């Protein structure tokens, strides 16, 4: 006789299986022009081991490359390049500043972007920027974009600005102003932040979303919701509305990239605690971060390759 616990577990697994099936089917009605490629990147966020262990695990899981913070320390730079070369991985870099003073912040940002872009070891697929701050003025934040446009034109590297809380593009209507005034602004699309900031799945901002989706060159594939930047497990049926919304946005980006024949990069970016919800007192994570990111890797590969 099946116990109630067993029944609930069987029901949950069956429902989850249906959700997985829906998103592992290839994207339809999306003609592919020559030149389209999908590159899926691994995050080192929350990884407990060494650089070599991280790169080895990413390669074994099927990732094409890694996304990692650019370091201003030469020894760390060499360690990163040695590890990706050893394991045959592509690379994308993260760059940012941290100071509360806009001029000092911009100086650090420029040093990081310039170092990542002009390194002589391995050309990055892209540079993703946590640009400016939400409390800097428009002109102060625009200086970050102006610098990256110049570096991108000089090097041919895609330099992108992430839709991220606390940064210049922290909310959809704020980002809309930048997009309206800077026609060649290119984005890393982490829409989970906008969902959290607006406390919605953005159904009331279709025009802004449509404009943003045309600017996306890189996706951070984490699923947020109305009350937070990360669901505890995207395979859980209670998150179906958020999952549906995020895949609809990502589908639109991929259709455009396929149509024009461009490389598309995606980072699977479910994070560790405190992004990952935990149990009280023990702080035990509610799900396995690495397993969720590999699930996202496999799902995205089947859908968008």
What are the roles of these predicted feature ranges?
Residues 51-52, 77-78, 106, 141-142, ...:
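Conserved strand-to-helix beginnings and helix N-cap segments that scaffold or border functional pockets
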Residues 12-13, 20, 101-186:
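Active-site acidic/histidine proton-transfer and metal-coordination neighborhood
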Residues 97-111, 135-137, 144, 230-240, ...:
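Surface-exposed, active-site-proximal loop segments in enzymatic domains
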Residues 31-33, 55-60, 74-93, 110-123, ...:
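Acidic (Asp/Glu)-rich catalytic clusters
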Residues 12, 19-22, 31-33, 52, ...:
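Histidine-acidic metal/acid-base catalytic patches
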Residues 41-46, 69-71, 96-100, 132-134, ...:
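Active-site beta-loop-alpha junctions enriched in small/polar residues
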Residues 36-43, 66-68, 91-96, 125-129, ...:
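Hydrophobic faces of well-ordered beta-strands that scaffold small-molecule active sites
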Residues 2-114, 290, 294-305:
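N-terminal pre-domain/capping segments
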């Amino acid at each position: 006789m099946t116990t109630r616990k067993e029944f609930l577990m069987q029901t949950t697994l069956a429902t989850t299986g249906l959700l997985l099936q829906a998103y592992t089917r290839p994207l339809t009605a999306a003609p592919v022009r020559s030149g389209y490629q999908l590159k899926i990147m691994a995050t080192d966020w929350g990884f407990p081991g060494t650089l070599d262990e991280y790169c080895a695990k990413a390669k074994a899981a099927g990732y094409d490359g890694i996304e990692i913070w650019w370091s201003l320390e030469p020894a760390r730079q060499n360690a990163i390049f040695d590890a990706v070369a050893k394991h045959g991985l592509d690379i994308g870099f993260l760059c940012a500043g941290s100071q509360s003073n806009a001029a000092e912040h911009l100086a650090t940002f420029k040093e990081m972007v310039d170092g990542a872009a002009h390194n002589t070891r391995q050309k990055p697929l892209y540079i993703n920027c946590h640009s400016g701050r939400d409390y800097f003025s428009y002109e102060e934040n625009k200086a970050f974009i102006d610098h990256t446009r110049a570096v991108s034109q000089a090097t041919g590297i895609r330099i992108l600005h992430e839709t991220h809380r606390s940064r210049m593009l922290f909310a959809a209507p704020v980002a809309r102003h930048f997009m309206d005034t800077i026609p060649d602004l290119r984005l890393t699309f982490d829409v989970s932040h906008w969902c959290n900031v607006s406390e919605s799945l953005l159904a009331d901002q279709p025009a802004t979303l449509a404009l943003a989706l045309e600017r996306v060159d890189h996706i951070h594939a984490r699923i947020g919701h109305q009350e937070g930047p990360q669901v505890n497990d995207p395979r859980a049926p209670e998150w179906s509305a958020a999952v549906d919304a995020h895949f609809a946005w990502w589908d639109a980006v991929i259709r455009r990239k396929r149509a024009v024949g461009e490389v598309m990069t995606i980072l699977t970016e479910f994070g560790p605690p405190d992004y990952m919800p935990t149990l009280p007192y023990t702080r035990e994570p509610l799900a396995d971060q690495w397993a969720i990111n590999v699930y996202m890797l496999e799902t995205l590969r089947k859908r968008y390759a």
